């Protein structure tokens, strides 16, 4: 945190990038500090559901737009907005590479997925508007309306059988 202290009832996103044998991995997870407000817990839960629903559509022959459509639909159904300023990305021996993975959009559009494609899905879901602002430090991002936001992320590989979640945690199953 830049210039602030954690307080009971805050939520925190920890985003971790690793390089192993020349290959990058990228993941993030939300944490609650103490007992949080029910509306913040719900935001974090729905954001995680957005990620999981997006992972379910990943397979050879699917389109990148399918990812954005399912995220946008689930967020909107729960009265949240999807940040459009940031997106997932291709990943491999280069940390950020093509394709861009939008978290909004139309099913059946965009790049068609093929076996071997590796990328991240990392939806940022807001309680209020989708708009964000970058603070003077040039790094910290906040929502324009000051309401809460949540983000979860995984690195994926498209396989012949569907998808492998390369950053799967012990408490998850896909």
Annotate each predicted stretch with a short phrase.
Residues 101-109, 122-152, 173-174:
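A conserved acidic, glycine/proline-rich C-terminal tail/linker
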Residues 9-10, 116:
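Loop/turn positions that initiate beta-strands
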Residues 1-8:
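Short, small-residue-biased leader/transition segments that mark boundaries at the very start
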Residues 12-14, 119, 156:
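Generic structural signal for buried aliphatic residues
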């Amino acid at each position: 945190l830049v210039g602030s202290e954690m307080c009971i009832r805050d939520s925190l996103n920890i985003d971790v990038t690793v390089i192993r044998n020349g290959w990058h991995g990228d993941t993030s997870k939300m944490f609650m500090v103490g007992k949080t407000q029910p509306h913040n817990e719900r935001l974090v839960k729905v954001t995680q559901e957005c990620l999981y629903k997006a992972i379910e559509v990943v397979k050879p022959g699917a389109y990148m737009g399918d990812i954005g459509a399912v995220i946008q639909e689930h967020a909107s159904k729960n009265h949240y907005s999807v940040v459009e300023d940031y997106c997932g990305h291709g990943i491999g021996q280069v940390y950020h590479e093509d394709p861009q993975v939008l978290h909004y959009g139309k099913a059946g559009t965009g790049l068609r997925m093929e076996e071997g494609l590796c990328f991240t899905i990392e939806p940022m879901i807001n309680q209020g508007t989708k708009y964000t602002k970058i603070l003077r430090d040039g790094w910290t991002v906040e929502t324009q309306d000051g309401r809460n936001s949540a983000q979860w992320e995984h690195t994926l590989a498209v396989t012949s059988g569907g998808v492998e979640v390369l950053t799967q945690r012990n408490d998850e199953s896909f």
